[in-house]
UniProtKB/Swiss-Prot annotation:
Residues that bind ATP: K201, H220, G236, L237, S238, G239, T240, G241, K242, T243, T244, E285, R323, T449
Protein's recorded name: Phosphoenolpyruvate carboxykinase (ATP)
GO MF annotations in UniProt: ATP binding; metal ion binding; phosphoenolpyruvate carboxykinase (ATP) activity
Chain positions recorded as substrate binding sites: R61, Y195, K201, R323
Database matches in InterPro entries: PEP_carboxykinase_ATP (IPR001272), PEP_carboxykinase_C (IPR013035), PEP_carboxykinase_N (IPR008210), PEPCK_ATP_CS (IPR015994)
Primary residence: cytoplasm
Catalyzed reactions: oxaloacetate + ATP = phosphoenolpyruvate + ADP + CO2
Gene (name only): pckA
Pathway where this protein functions: Carbohydrate biosynthesis; gluconeogenesis
UniProt keyword annotations, A-Z: ATP-binding, Cytoplasm, Decarboxylase, Gluconeogenesis, Lyase, Manganese, Metal-binding, Nucleotide-binding
Length: 538
């Protein structure tokens, strides 16, 4: 077996059980990985120098194909209502079949950190059969210093082989595509999917499992920090604006998707960004556009002009879930440490497909826990398989249900405790629709959202007049300089006021129905933070 690159010779591929490999390329950088990827026909080069790959059938995560080993520990610890199980024996069979499938192949290995805080990071080794997947995960996680690689000993190992086909009868899964996690052995097996996002989310799921018991709350969020060390956290599902809104030229970006909040403050789990880039434009999102149109960026499922190789970001013919992966330092004002002090603001983003939530509302700590556990948004087409072309209302608890190994109340209680401990202001922001439901109304203007967020984060929104929303009970500003006052009260943007009232009451009912499963796990204060019961019943 040939091996190239810097590595820990005492802890190589054989320690993981990989044998009879043709070659292992260790910790290669972007130039070498570009070369291998292009020469193998895995990807093509854009006119701007980005590496462009197609993921084939799977253009998003496939949650139905994700499984966790159920053993004596996970049986009691895991949130099985939100996770699927396989036995230790089924996992072992799958693992051995992965090792057999790898024989004779050339693999790419990356040694990386999940987590910017040395006290809480997890040393992660990722084996991939594709060069562009190796570049992707190298871009998304945190790259150690070269001197650290010669002694790197992994805690978590991922093997990613899209050409592997699982057997549901043999392996206990549902299709030929599989993501299987064994927390006891700290091994993740990914087969059948060329969608690179499965790798990064496997690291996130692992950190979600281990960090709470160490006093760190893992979060599906973006984060940034102002000049006064005033960090802000942005919760939200894919497509709600986490990446876009945290890329603020007046604030330092900590990260765009996954963070921990603990005794030392906030820290990024990653060293890169994974931005949705459908309809990406230089005018609307200059930082993300610049980061996506240069050497070192990895583009997924973007359409290129056949002659010029110029990327057409408006073309969603392959999928609406086109993606750009790039290192954090491609953003000019990104943090070099990936860390920030205790946050001053928490923002929950919801793409409200019904068009009845206000563009911004202030939440009490109890309301914050209620809306965090509810995790309301609209699933946007393309971020997962099996969705149609229209957004669908979705309650994804903790704004990240697919990534939660533990019961949601674990994360909800941590959030409320941290908010109280650090006196954090909480906001609910609607980045979805205004002036009507999806199909009738229009998307909330990003300039309005940015203006309201700026006012919230710099403290000026605290000094304006608020009204209490009659449907949801939270506080909504009545006026703010530079923002049209009618947009602050959603009913004023609807032509049919009766239809608005009917739609708002229906959404209240949906919240109540969804939250019923959490009633027994929260106290009276959080139950009282729910939208008004009488309204839904009228």
């Amino acid at each position: 077996m040939q091996e190239t690159g810097v590595r820990n010779g005492a802890f190589g591929a054989d320690k993981f059980g990989l044998k009879n490999l043709k070659q292992v390329h260790w910790n290669l950088g972007a130039p070498q990985l570009y070369q291998y990827s292009l020469s193998a026909g895995e990807a093509v080069l854009s006119a701007d120098g980005a590496l462009c790959a197609d993921t084939g059938e799977f253009t998003g995560r496939s949650p139905k194909d994700k499984f966790t080993v159920r053993d004596a520990t996970t049986d009691k610890k895991m949130w099985w209502a939100g996770n699927q199980s396989i036995t230790a024996e089924q996992f072992e069979t799958l693992y051995q079949d992965f090792l057999k499938h790898a024989e004779g192949k050339s693999l790419f290995a990356q040694d990386l950190y999940g987590g910017a805080d040395p006290a809480y990071r997890i040393k992660t080794r990722v084996f991939t059969e594709l060069a562009w997947h190796s570049l992707f995960i190298r871009t998304l996680l945190i790259r150690p210093e070269a001197i650290e690689l010669s002694t790197f000993t992994p805690e978590l190992t991922i093997i990613d082989m899209p050409s592997f086909r699982a057997d549901p009868k043999r392996h206990g899964c549902k299709s030929e595509n599989v993501v299987a996690i064994d927390f006891a052995r700290k091994i993740v097996l990914i087969g059948g999917s060329y969608y690179a996002g499965e790798m990064k989310k496997s690291v996130f799921t692992t950190l979600n499992y281990y960090l709470p018991e160490r006093g760190v709350m893992p979060m599906h969020c973006s984060a940034n920090v102002g000049a006064k060390d005033d960090a802000a956290i942005f919760f939200g599902l894919s497509g709600t604006g986490k990446t876009t809104l945290s890329a603020d030229p007046n604030r330092t970006l900590i990260g765009d998707d996954e963070h921990g909040w603990g005794p030392n403050g906030v820290f990024n789990f990653e060293g890169g960004c994974y931005a949705k880039c459908i309809k990406l434009s230089q005018e609307a999102e200059p930082q993300i556009y610049a980061a996506s149109t240069r050497f070192g960026a990895v583009l997924e499922n973007c359409v290129l002009d056949e002659d010029t190789r110029v990327v057409d970001f408006d073309d969603g013919s392959k999928t609406e879930n086109t993606r750009s992966a790039y290192p954090l330092d491609f953003i000019p004002n990104a943090s070099r440490t990936g860390r920030a002090p205790q946050p001053k603001n928490v923002v929950m983003l919801a793409a409200d497909a019904f068009g009845v939530l206000p563009p911004i509302a202030k939440l009490s700590p109890a309301q914050a826990m209620y809306h965090f556990l509810s995790g309301y948004t609209a699933k946007v087409a393309g971020t997962e398989r099996g969705l149609g072309n229209e957004p669908q209302p979705e309650f994804s608890t903790c704004f990240g249900s697919p990534f939660l190994p533990l019961d949601p109340s674990v994360y909800g209680n941590m959030l409320r405790d941290l908010i109280a401990q650090h006196n954090v202001d909480c906001w609910l922001v609607n980045t979805g629709w205004t002036g009507g439901k999806y199909g009738t109304g229009s998307r909330m203007p990003i300039k309005v959202t940015r203006a309201l967020l700026t006012a919230a984060l710099d403290g000026s929104l605290r000094n304006v007049e608020f009204r209490t929303d009659k449907y949801f009970g939270f506080a909504v500003p009545t006026a703010l300089p530079g923002v049209p006052s009618e947009i602050l009260n959603p009913v004023n943007t609807w032509k049919d006021k009766d239809e608005f009232d009917k739609t708002a009451r229906a959404l209240v009912g949906m919240f109540q129905k969804n939250f019923a499963k959490f009633e027994a796990q929260v106290d009276a204060e959080v139950r009282a933070a729910a939208p008004d019961v009488k309204l839904a019943a009228e």
